[in-house]
Structure formats: structure tokens, C-alpha cells
A protein has these predicted regions:
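Residue-level preference for long, well-ordered alpha-helices that form the structural scaffold
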Residues: 20, 54, 83, 178-179
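Conserved, mostly hydrophobic/aromatic
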Residues: 31, 40, 65, 107, ...
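Catalytic pocket-lining loop regions of alpha/beta-barrel enzymes
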Residues: 35-39, 48-155
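Structured beta->alpha junctions
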Residues: 16, 83, 134, 160-161
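Mid-to-C-terminal alpha-helical segments outside catalytic/metal-binding sites
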Residues: 30, 150-153, 163-198
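Mid-domain alpha/beta scaffold segments of enzyme catalytic cores
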Residues: 1-56, 64, 126-127, 191
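Short, surface-exposed amphipathic charged segments that create phosphate/polyanion-binding patches used
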Residues: 25-30, 143-146, 197
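A generic structural motif
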Residues: 42-46, 131-133, 183-188
Length: 198
């Protein structure tokens, strides 16, 4: 789908519960090596049964992504089947076990904003994409953290189609990010994490 559109990048989604571990690993390798996908998306809290990010079933997938040099993207918002699967505490175990693996957290583990910011402070391989949740109560803490230590760990996102892309760009630019960090948030961090210049 993205081949005719060089301005787009592809991210592969893998469900180890439907494919099995060997099948999931094979699909990750195919997605990265053959299809040129830039990251692998996992949605553990939406599995059947739902899993936490540090479930042992996921560790072989983290390992192969680490070996291939591609980030893992985790779905981490309040729409999971139960809020316990949005708790970011298990994320710390994954970040500690795979310190070179970039972990990109869609929806920024909202509503656990302060907790995930604290974990990201400890583990520089954690990257937050608060997307539409940055506009909800408590979202200002993402901005405050990005204006300090989190400048290289926050990435822009929209949650499209739930929020219009153009409007989200305009709204992000009005959130109060310092001039020194806004370029990183809007594109520089994503370019680095996804290795788009490589």
C-alpha cells in the first residue's frame, strides 16, 4: 500500500496469540526484511485474552525487534478492555530488559500520565505519543515534561480518524511547547526513532 506513496511509511501489526510465537516472529522478519516496514505494532491489551506489556509471551517479539533494529509500538490508551491493561508499570520491565529497543507508546498510557512520564524519565528508550489525549485533563503534563527532560522522547500523533490531522497540527503548535523542542516533537524525534534517514 505504501510503495507508490514514498511520503508514507508502513508499520506492521502482529498478534502472537493468533499466529503463535514462531509465526509472529516469522511475520516480523518478513515485515521488516522483505516489506521494509519501519516498526512493529503490538496491542497486548486488546488480545484474547488481554495481556500486559510485560507478559512473557511478548518477550520473544521484543527480542527479535531489538535484533532487527526496529521499534516496537504499543497501544496504550483508555479504550482497552480493562483499565488494568493501560497501567504503564509493566512497561518499565520491558524497557529495562531491552535497553536498546525503542518503545513507542501510542496514546501515551493515558490516563496514567504522571506514571508513564516517571517511567520515561527512568528509561530513555520509551517514547510517548499522547496524540488526542494531550488535549484532555492532565495532558498538560506531557507538554511540561517535553519542555524539560522528555524533549527527545515525545512524538506527535493525531489519532486520526478520531481527530482531524490539520486541526491537530494547529492545536499542537498552540500547546506551549518551547521553540527549542517543537521541531523535535513534530518530526525530528520520529525521524530518529523510525530511522527514516537511514
Amino acid at each position: 500500500l505504501t510503495a507508490p506513496h514514498p511520503q508514507l511509511i508502513a508499520i506492521g501489526s502482529i498478534d502472537p496469540q493468533t499466529r503463535g510465537i514462531k509465526g509472529a516472529i516469522a511475520e516480523i522478519e518478513r515485515a521488516v526484511k522483505q516489506l521494509g516496514m519501519k516498526a512493529i505494532n503490538l496491542e497486548p491489551g486488546f488480545g484474547s485474552p488481554p495481556l500486559k506489556a510485560d507478559d512473557a509471551l511478548l518477550f520473544p517479539l521484543y527480542d527479535v525487534c531489538d535484533q532487527l533494529g526496529v521499534p516496537v509500538c504499543l497501544m496504550s490508551g483508555p479504550t482497552s478492555p480493562a483499565l488494568e491493561f493501560t497501567d504503564p508499570a509493566p512497561l518499565a520491565r520491558v524497557a529495562r530488559a531491552f535497553p536498546r529497543l525503542p518503545i513507542v507508546c501510542y496514546h501515551g498510557f493515558y490516563p496514567y500520565v504522571n506514571e508513564v512520564i516517571g517511567i520515561a524519565f527512568r528509561y530513555e528508550n520509551i517514547h510517548l505519543v499522547p496524540d488526542m489525549y494531550i488535549f484532555l485533563p492532565g495532558g498538560n503534563y506531557y507538554v511540561e515534561a517535553a519542555n524539560g527532560f522528555l524533549a527527545d522522547q515525545l512524538l506527535f500523533g493525531t489519532s486520526y480518524p478520531f481527530r482531524a490531522m490539520g486541526q491537530t497540527v494547529e492545536d499542537y503548535l498552540r500547546l506551549g511547547f518551547r521553540d527549542a523542542v517543537i521541531e523535535r516533537i513534530m518530526h525530528g524525534n520520529a525521524e530518529r526513532v523510525l530511522r527514516l534517514g537511514v
